[in-house]
Amino acid sequence: MSRRSTAEKKTAKSDPIYHNRLVNMVVNRILKNGKKSLAYRILYRAIKKIQQKTDKNPLSVLRQAIRRVTPNVTVKARRVGGSTYRVPTEIRSTQGKVLAIRWLLGASRKRPGRNMNFKLSHELMDAARGNGNAIRKKEETHRMAEANRAFAHFR
């Protein structure tokens, strides 16, 4: 039995403008090479673009996009007796949210064009509507989990 106490869960801080933890989680995922001010600028411009295009609350669009992309199950590779099985496992809501943010940003980076805030805003709007590459990624993951349901007992 370990003598160490369990580590406390770190809670995400809220961002300076919207005072929202979800916005800060997205900013930390956009971050490259420690340029946080650039990451904030990209997200805030994307949010402004969403507001101009949809006339809705951009934070609700962001929340809805993340909710739509968040997966319920994922597949993990598990090695049993020399062969590798893709085992479907349920994931917690926080891990699902992290995966959703990662997929949204990956899909927006792959979009054609040069401007990241433009690509991110369009990907968020598409995901909120229920289409886009991030939604496709979620559906693909769910299909993989459904196809490998026979291996669920390997958990």
Curated annotation (Swiss-Prot):
**Keyword DNA damage listed:** no
Keywords of this protein's UniProt record, alphabetized?
Answer: Chloroplast, Plastid, Ribonucleoprotein, Ribosomal protein, RNA-binding, rRNA-binding
According to the lineage, what is the superkingdom?
Eukaryota
Q: Does the keyword Plastid apply?
A: yes
Q: Which Gene3D superfamilies match?
A: Ribosomal protein S7 domain
Q: What is its main location?
A: plastid
Q: Where does it live in the cell?
A: Plastid, Chloroplast
Residue runs in coiled coils: none
Q: Which GO terms describe its molecular function?
A: rRNA binding; structural constituent of ribosome
Q: What is this protein called?
A: Small ribosomal subunit protein uS7c
- The gene is rps7
